Design a protein with these regions (language model features):
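Extended substrate-binding grooves/exosites of carbohydrate-active enzymes
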Residues: 1-31, 182, 292-615, 619-627, ...
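Accessory carbohydrate-binding/adhesion or oligomerization-edge regions at the termini
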Residues: 1-89, 173, 246, 527, ...
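Accessory beta-strand-rich segments of carbohydrate-active enzymes
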Residues: 1-21, 28-29, 44-48, 68, ...
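An acidic-aromatic loop/edge-strand motif
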Residues: 8, 76-79, 84, 91-98, ...
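Beta-strand/loop-rich accessory regions of lumenal/periplasmic or secreted enzymes
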Residues: 79, 131, 176, 276, ...
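Beta-strand-rich binding/interaction modules
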Residues: 140, 222-256, 613-648, 658-661, ...
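Extended acidic/polar, glycine-enriched regions
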Residues: 164-167, 231-304, 675-715
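Catalytic cores of secreted or luminal carbohydrate-active enzymes
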Residues: 187-207, 556-608, 612-615, 619-627, ...
């Protein structure tokens, strides 16, 4: 098919399209819709390898071809079995040769018949495409209508002159790549097709086309002004503008006569009910003509930046949110309202109040839902040119990164994308910040896009993180940017910015704490800085959901999820798309629980122990704490409930602190904790939802004393007989046999009741299956050989004292071709009850990278599945990732402890345990330890690429860890903070284990 190559012409972005307008779908004056969806299962589709091979007759009204299959619209053709799925984290998937794209440019040819009534034919008819990737040509009844691109922004075509009464034929040719592909190198799967709705709109000859709504407030918020302006119209309509209160009562109306250039009005509202994310109250604006009605829900609110602080309704506000893609594991970019409502409902229940639409406008009705549900939105343009970083050459990074934004040829295309973003969503109250795009360097093209935005909409601040890459030497005017934005800074970087007297703009973390796999860790360290600092607008976790694609089930019934490279595509970024707080199917990761409690609406601190007095910090921005939550408490001593009840919540204004008294003060010398739980009040939208908790230590024992049971204590107990050889020490008595391997430095056999309790010799653990956030440092771990370390025992000795057997050993741990990284001395005591106490001390060679873990591993028979532990649960927990958990006694199973990440990795450990049991194994530490039990070895988790490939072992692997290093977010963020690393030079550890009779 011969096409005019608009798709390779940077001077032609849209042909035959209407000027962009705000999003709405009009109604008739009788309340019925003036539009209808052309979406459905009745489109015909054929996939072509390139434009040249397209049958040019497919656009004709009467064309029929049995090879064209039925296709659902909206959908992505890759999700329907055509082409292949391709994940790229930012690299261009075609050669960099703008504006050109490969000749082998796959195409989807669509056609659909639809009827137009005589009544509709008397009106102006428009086709509204909400989203098509990447570029598309449109024909109606065989006549060319136009062309457009910018995948995630709408395109509207006037088809009045092409339409006929009765049957009409719509034909669309979608190209996989255009010159716009160079501007859409976001971190996402690359899908194609008509992936959002197509709507036919019938409008009167005289009608409103575009309008702007703005609200302003008096300083004391007692008066509001509702500004309405007609930006464009056709004909000379008389437009009645009406304002309705949230309860439906009419507050005001005025008629604007366009014939007289009467184009704007201002309504004054006394004692307005203001919109914010905590109370998303909406007014209704109605624009009526003789033949049409447009309805717009509007929240009264005002955004400003003053003295380096972002204010909403004259109050400091904190945006604690997520980055969100439109993403479905089965349908790609195509998401339904029900799908999005599920996302928003989950977010709301998890204390999330803000969303960055990364890195493109989400579905056009998305912001309407955010208005209703209460979210602050950073609305981002469909723009990222990350792929220029892969170009070959010696240019400075700021030149390479900014190659496109500094190229005049791309100027209009970049500004166009921001215009489409802003104009579509300008009337949506939830949008509080505009974003120019993502990771594209900095230069004149973006500067002009920012300046246009500031001029067009001076009521909202403008964001762009990529100005970071703008040193002297290029045009570096950042006056169009209202905040300093950073991705994954260290806590120290944030503190440094705040301490700099020249830092006058507010600070925002548009991406932080990478939620990939088992993560994120280190949230609390950031929030300790973010929450109290008014100059920090907020922070957005990367990201909301995993983007794995669902590919059915294995023969044994396991779900199969694929990621980058699983389709043979190149280039790809592997499982880097698996970085969400929720799985692709929206099951929560433990990271979501972690983020939820980290941003809980209340924070408690202990003020006095007797009487028990607790300070409550109301972290909400607009709600008195007494109106928001019910506070209940429980006090537990080592897992045993001492008391519980509710607390009368005092009146505490937003951002302020107050005090509560707990009516009981326990007298105890054991581990005792107060847990406060915050539940949403019944009159709130989240009625009954638990919004978070605090746990406060009232008393914590310093150290357990691990004392072996001797003859003096139990004179009637049988003593151990000792058999010593060059290889082993064998301890025996009736029905019991314990064998110590003098070469391994651990016990190889523990027989009790004539049954071996361990399936393999014990071993020292120095490696874990790397988490995604270990991806960088795990290379160092492998270089150090932690994954293949062996023990060298230099000497052992055995003695008996008062019935207690003591085995002394001196040994090191090293890997092939490397010197030892650990030199240790151990004393193993076996007492008369069969309890084994390990006392270990030694040194770590700090020339090596920090250890992922250090501990003792046991393998138990596979029927030992019941688990009890006293430590941080119920979720997996680590030194920097335990805010979702609390200290308690938990009863669970090995299977329930396993966190089934799509990309297998370290999981399911529990931090700060006093004791733990698996089956009849019982372990207790002198100091708290980390504990884990799993059907999978770290080797199995390390070697398999997908969870459906995992094969459970014939036993249960138990890890009793002196420590595990923290989780962090180093897959994209900074290196794990040193305080969470195992790199102390001196190691001292004491732990006891025993096997009881029975389970």
């Amino acid at each position: 098919m011969e096409l005019i190559h608009y798709y390779e012409d940077l001077n032609t972005l849209h042909v035959g399209t209407e000027k962009p307008r705000c999003y709405y779908l009009p109604k008739k004056t009788d309340g019925t819709d003036s539009y209808r969806l052309l979406s459905g299962n009745d489109w015909r589709f054929f996939y072509y390898p390139n434009p040249q091979s397209v049958d040019e007759k497919f656009v004709l009204k009467d064309y029929e071809n049995p090879e064209y299959v039925m296709m659902e619209v909206p959908s992505c053709w890759q999700s329907k079995g055509y082409d292949y799925k391709h994940y790229s984290g930012g690299a261009f998937v075609i050669p960099y040769d703008p504006p050109y794209v490969p000749d082998e440019n796959p195409c989807g040819a669509y056609y659909k018949d639809f009827d137009i009534s005589n009544e509709e034919l008397e009106k102006d008819l428009y086709l509204y495409f909400e989203g098509v990737e990447a570029g598309f040509y449109v024909w109606v009844n065989g006549q060319f209508v136009g062309y457009s691109q910018v995948s995630h922004s709408p395109s509207e075509f006037d088809i009045t002159r092409f339409a006929k009464a009765g049957k009409n034929r719509l034909a669309v040719l979608v190209l996989k790549w255009t010159d716009g592909t160079y501007l859409e190198a976001q971190d996402k799967y690359r899908y194609n097709g008509i992936f959002r709705d197509v709507t036919l709109i019938a409008r009167p000859k005289s009608a409103v086309v575009d309008y702007t709504v703005r609200t302003t407030l008096s300083e004391d918020n007692t008066k509001a002004e509702f500004f309405v302006r007609l930006d464009s119209y056709k004909g000379l309509p008389n437009v009645t503008v009406s304002l309705f209160a949230p309860d439906g009562s009419k507050l005001a109306n005025e008629t604007l006569a366009t014939e007289n250039k009467d184009l704007e009005t201002v309504f004054k509202v006394n004692d307005p009910i203001l919109w914010n994310a905590e109370h998303p109250t909406l007014y209704k604006l109605v624009l009526s003509t003789d033949d049409e009605v447009i309805e717009q829900k509007v929240g009264i609110r005002e955004v400003e930046i003053k003295d380096g602080v972002m204010l909403l309704n004259h109050r400091p506000v904190k945006l604690l949110g997520v980055n969100r893609h439109d993403s479905s594991p089965t349908d790609g970019y195509t998401v339904s309202r029900e799908h999005v409502v599920r996302d928003l409902t989950m977010m709301k229940k998890n204390n999330i109040n803000a969303i960055r639409t990364s890195h493109y406008p989400n579905a056009p009705w998305f912001t309407e839902l955010c208005n209703e549900y209460g979210f602050y939105v950073i609305a981002e343009a469909d723009f990222e040119t990350h792929g220029t970083m892969d170009l070959v050459g010696e240019e400075p990074i700021y030149r390479k990164f900014g190659k496109i934004v500094q190229d005049p040829a791309f100027h209009d295309a970049i500004v166009d994308r921001m215009m489409l973003n802003v104009i579509r969503d300008k009337n949506e109250s939830c949008v509080v910040i505009w974003s120019l795009g993502n990771e594209s360097g900095y230069g004149k093209n973006l500067i002009d896009a920012g300046k246009w935005t500031k001029e067009y909409d001076p009521t909202r601040p403008v964001h762009y993180e990529g100005a970071t890459w703008a040193p002297p030497g290029i045009e570096n005017d950042q006056s169009c940017l209202d905040m300093v934005s950073r991705m994954y800074p260290t806590v120290e970087t944030i503190k440094k910015y705040l301490a700099d007297p020249t830092s006058v703009k507010p600070f925002i973390l548009c991406e932080f704490v990478h939620a990939m796999g088992n993560g994120p860790g280190d949230i609390e360290d950031y929030l300790e800085v973010i929450l109290p600092e008014k100059r920090i607008i907020g922070a957005f976790v990367w990201e909301w959901c995993d983007h794995a694609t669902y590919e059915g089930k294995t023969p044994d019934g396991k779900d199969k999820y694929f990621y980058g490279g699983d389709y043979g595509e190149f280039p790809h970024d592997g499982n880097f798309c698996m970085d969400g707080l929720v799985y692709s199917d929206r099951r929560p990761h433990t990271g979501l629980h972690e983020w939820k409690n980290a941003i809980r609406p209340v924070r408690a601190t202990l003020q006095e122990i007797s009487p028990l007095k607790v300070s409550l910090w109301n972290r909400l921005d607009f709600t008195n704490l007494d109106d928001a939550v019910i506070v209940t408490y429980e006090i537990k001593e080592e897992g045993r409930l001492l008391s519980q009840g509710s607390v009368a919540v005092p009146s505490i204004e937003p951002h302020e602190k107050g005090f509560v008294l707990i009516p009981e003060t326990p007298k105890t010398n054991k581990n005792t904790y107060l847990k406060l739980t915050y539940t949403a009040k019944q009159r709130t939208a989240l009625a009954g939802e638990v919004l978070g908790f605090d746990q406060i230590a009232l008393f914590e024992e310093q150290d357990e004393v691990l004392t072996p049971v001797s003859k003096t204590a139990l004179p009637a107990f049988a003593s151990w007989s000792v058999n010593e050889t060059a290889d082993i020490y064998e301890l025996t008595r009736d029905g019991e046999c314990i064998v110590f391997d003098r070469h391994l430095g651990t016990f190889a056999k523990i027989v009790k009741d004539n049954e071996n309790q361990i399936s393999e010799p014990m071993r020292f653990l120095t490696f874990r299956a790397p988490t995604n956030n270990d991806s960088a440092v795990s290379k160092e771990w492998r270089m150090a050989g932690y994954d293949r370390s062996t023990v060298k025992v230099y000497e052992t000795s055995i003695q008996e004292t008062d019935g207690v057997i003591e085995i002394h050993s001196r040994f090191s741990i090293a890997s092939p071709a490397k010197q030892p990284f650990l030199r240790l001395q151990a004393v193993w005591k076996v007492d008369l009850e069969g309890t084994i106490i390990l006392s270990l001390d030694g040194n770590f060679d700090k020339v090596f990278p920090y250890l992922p873990r250090f501990g003792l591993g046991l393998k138990l028979p596979n029927d030992k599945t019941d688990v009890t532990y006293y430590g941080y649960g119920p979720y997996e927990s680590y030194s920097d990732k335990h805010r979702a958990s609390w200290v308690d006694r938990f009863d669970t199973t090995v299977d329930d402890m396993f966190e089934d990440y799509v990309f297998p990795q370290e999981n399911g450990s529990h931090y700060n345990c006093q004791y733990a049991s698996v089956g009849n194994l019982y372990a207790k530490g002198k100091k708290p330890f980390s504990f884990q039990a799993s059907r999978y070895s770290e080797k199995e988790l390390d070697e398999k690429a997908h969870n459906f490939e995992l094969v459970p072992s014939d036993g249960i692997y138990v890890a009793l860890d002196y420590k595990q290093s923290g989780i962090g977010s180093n897959s994209c963020g900074p290196r794990l903070a040193e305080k969470y690393q195992i790199r102390e030079e001196k190691i001292e550890w004491e732990i006891s284990i025993r096997f009881d009779n029975g389970n």
